[in-house]
């Protein structure tokens, strides 16, 4: 059985070796429920990634949180790192996966 890889444990050079650019990459943003979370995620993503994005939203069972998944075509590792940082700055966001 293959061993699971935790991306946090890998240095950036290793992460670059795992990904071949350009590649499809999905971000999942989890935040406190608010109506404009999807619009904020799309706006930030479009600043840093070209092409269409098709956000998918899911609300938690108690309605407290929303998760927004969004796909991009990543051109390089710096783009991925920048998006992680920028998406985490959105009001109410608790984590970016």
Curated annotation (Swiss-Prot):
Coiled coil: none annotated. SUPFAM superfamilies: YbeD/HP0495-like (SSF117991). Pfam families: DUF493. One of its GO terms (cellular component) is cytosol. It comes from the Bacteria. Belongs to the UPF0250 family. HAMAP family: UPF0250. PANTHER family: UPF0250 PROTEIN YBED. This is UPF0250 protein HD_2015.
